[in-house]
Regions:
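Bacterial N-terminal signal peptides that target proteins for export
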Residues: 1-9
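Extracellular glycan-interacting surfaces
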Residues: 14, 20-708
């Protein structure tokens, strides 16, 4: 080889990109539809088969067949937008063109949101105004809309972010100007359907502990009669959400404090009680009589409480009447969708809309799905196919049979598959005793059919075990472990020894016997011993499912019995110096960046560990974690490291914006170029098993690809 050829080869090695794999299958999504909080559905007036929807943690989505199937649009976001969490809060379709949309999106006070436009049906988007406070996944995201379009002039829009003031939009959302009313937390803003130039804005009181930056907000119910140029405060107390009927007088229906419905027949100047016939609200969040969703037809109103009870009141009726539901059809489950959303029908309902073309056609969104009825509420069916909005924590494959998978998620615990992810089972009886999310899964490498999961929230934090190949689950005796409590002593990481019947657990809380630290079991989880001598008192192991990176392993165990863990607060790594007595010592590796370390043990090379953190902080150890050598082949922040336990040398790095795969133990990497074409977050967190990639998205399920 001449010198030029050698130089090209060296450059390729240094870049870590050697070219694609010889054969790759296409990415496939786990076929589980539903499972996240759907906020609203918008239907095109010019093309009624075109629908848009959005979820609190992802979206938007588009349907071209009236909700029978959907496709995601949020894969077009940049790395920065994904990192900031551009979750839609409200969306408006141009009534003249179904491909022309405007929407507002964002996530938190610190990571500000944007106003977006798309003129090609969501294939591409542009941020026309940046750095506004929209909370698509924030407080009161279920109330009202924060973007509306003038029914008399579709080129004019209005929006109301938190604290930034109201903004008036012109030229179909291309230009915006501030119209005042800063320092308010708005929950709803709408044009009057009958009076040109009239707009209503709702800014109810905000619980200080729930407001984004804990600062106080002004309150009030406002009306503008000059298209948003000036505003009049009609009263200090504001409804959370309003809807307007087209009956005589165009009355407004409002939700107050989630427990009372009132009506205004004078354009919001005064409000009268309108809750006759409704039950008194319980104290729980999910209860009869607590409302978040109302709808308006031409001459009637609808209301759905958080327990999923639907009520109707015709204009002129003396009271509300319960809509008798005769059947709920989970269409996706009956055709392979795997999630029984019917059992949660209407839970925390966020919206209910009446189709103006057919007022017997209602569309409701709730915690898990989209529902529609064509007979005014007697029979309902889901419309959620191809929307997988599950927040995914982890995936694990059975070491004895790669077709057996366990998929840990937020809120609805976990799913199991026996055909490699082609279909899944989700039976609540399987996980009796655990609620919330499963953050960690460990299969025994010695005993076939034995698996462990951990996670949960509030009073259900625990460890469950299956000894019959995922058929049934039960809590082991757990002798020797402290009382497991969410936010105190909790377990969110389990790890199995690849060569022995040993399982390790990281327990949060102060590191001392009977409290926090690393525990080890040699009898499949029935008894545990404290295994944490030498670890500092404050290891800061995850104490809740939403702790930063709680789903990433906090301990890694090698085939020689070595182990590495890390302090979540100081970023210091520790190695197991005495494998019999459980004595730990500090490694020579301590990260200084704000991100948490990730660690993994090579299942084939004893003592070989990989560790990563922020950009250019990739390192490896060959002595069980005692010393690490820093490498410079990975310029991105590393979000996950996963060795393939069935193929020596294969390892996947999930990085910020890149997915890298190595076939030489992590020395060089190839980039899976199409990973960023998938919807999801900025992280490419990935599990590698049997040359299969399981890409765990932030809130769009899991995608798989086979490498050959």
């Amino acid at each position: 080889m001449n010198s030029a050829g050698k130089s090209m080869l060296v450059c390729a090695l240094l870049s870590g990109v050697l070219g694609g794999f010889a054969e790759e299958t296409q990415w496939k999504q786990f076929p589980i539809w539903g499972g996240g909080y759907v906020q609203n559905v918008e239907i095109s007036k010019s093309s009624p088969n075109v629908w848009y929807t959005y979820v609190d943690v992802c979206g938007p989505y588009r349907s071209d067949d009236a909700g029978n199937s959907w496709r995601p649009l949020h894969q077009v976001y940049s790395i920065n937008e994904r990192y900031r969490g551009m979750n839609p809060r409200s969306l408006s379709i141009d009534p003249r063109n179904p491909d022309s949309i405007v929407y507002v999106a964002g996530n938190s006070w610190d990571l500000k949101g944007n106003i977006y436009v798309s003129r090609d049906g969501g294939k591409s988007v542009r941020a026309v105004v940046k750095d506004l406070h929209f909370y698509g996944n924030g407080y009161r995201r279920w109330t009202g809309i924060l973007l509306d379009r003038n029914p008399f002039n579709p080129d004019e829009l209005i929006t109301a972010p938190d604290s930034d003031g109201i903004f008036r939009g012109t030229e179909n959302g291309e230009k915006w100007e501030n119209a005042g009313l800063k320092d308010h937390f708005f929950t709803d803003i709408r044009y009057d359907l009958a009076v040109p130039g009239r707009i209503y804005a709702c800014a109810p009181a905000v619980a200080p502990e729930r407001s984004a930056d804990r600062k106080p907000r002004q309150t009030g119910f406002y009306r503008s009669d000059d298209n948003g140029k000036t505003w009049k405060r009609l009263q200090e107390t504001a409804p959370e959400e309003i809807k307007q009927a087209r009956a005589k007088g165009n009355p407004l229906l409002g939700i107050f404090d989630m427990t009372e419905l009132r009506i205004s027949e004078d354009a919001g100047a005064t409000w009268k009680p309108y809750s006759e016939g409704l039950p008194e609200a319980g104290k729980e969040y999910i209860t009869n009589g607590r409302f978040q969703a109302i709808g308006a037809g031409s001459d009637f109103f609808l209301a759905v409480d958080t327990a999923g009870t639907v009520y109707r009141r015709n204009i002129g009726d003396p009271e509300w009447k319960r809509v008798i539901i005769r059947r709920r059809i989970n269409r996706e489950y009956e055709t392979g969708g795997q999630l029984r959303t019917a059992q949660w029908f209407g839970r925390a309902a966020a919206s209910i809309n009446i189709d103006p073309r057919d007022e017997k056609h209602w569309i409701m969104t709730d915690w898990f799905a989209i529902w529609e009825t064509f007979d005014a509420g007697k029979k309902w069916q889901t419309a959620i196919r191809n929307i997988c909005q599950l927040i995914s924590f982890t995936v694990a494959a059975d070491p004895f049979d790669g077709n057996n998978l366990i998929y840990g998620v937020a809120d609805v615990v976990f799913f199991t598959s026996r055909n490699g992810g082609k279909s899944f089972e989700h039976d609540p009886s399987h996980y009796s005793g655990i609620l919330g999310g499963v953050c960690s899964i460990a299969f025994s490498r010695i005993s076939k059919g034995v698996a462990f999961i951990c996670g949960g929230k509030q009073g259900s934090t625990t460890i469950l075990r299956s000894k019959d190949g995922m058929k049934t689950w039960a809590r082991p005796a757990l002798k020797g472990l402290p009382k497991l409590e969410y936010g105190k002593c909790a377990v969110y990481t389990l790890a199995a020894n690849p060569k022995k019947e040993e399982i390790f657990a990281c327990v949060s809380g102060p590191v001392e016997p009977g409290k926090g630290g690393v525990y080890k079991s040699t009898d499949m989880g029935d008894t545990w011993v404290w295994f944490s001598t030498g670890l500092p008192a404050d290891m800061s192991y995850a104490s809740g499912e939403w702790d930063n990176n709680a789903a990433n392993p906090q301990i890694a165990v090698g085939p020689d019995g070595s182990a590495v863990t890390f302090n979540r607060k100081t970023k210091q790594l520790y190695y197991l110096a005495d494998r019999e007595k459980g004595i730990w010592k500090a490694s020579d590796l301590r990260y200084t960046s704000w991100t948490l370390p990730v660690i993994a043990a090579d299942p084939f090379v004893p003592g070989h560990y990989l560790a990563g953190c922020a950009a250019n902080e990739y390192a490896e150890s060959f002595d069980g974690g005692k010393t690490f050598r820093r490498l410079t082949t990975v310029p991105e922040t590393i979000e996950s490291i996963s060795f393939d336990e069935h193929n020596p040398g294969w390892v996947a790095l999930g990085c910020t914006g890149k997915l890298r795969v190595s076939r030489d133990g992590g020395k060089t990497f190839e980039v899976i170029e199409d990973a960023m074409s998938l919807p999801g977050g900025h992280s490419m967190r990935t599990i590698l098993d049997r040359k299969r990639l399981f890409l765990i998205t932030g809130a769009s399920g899991v995608y798989t690809k086979e490498l050959k």
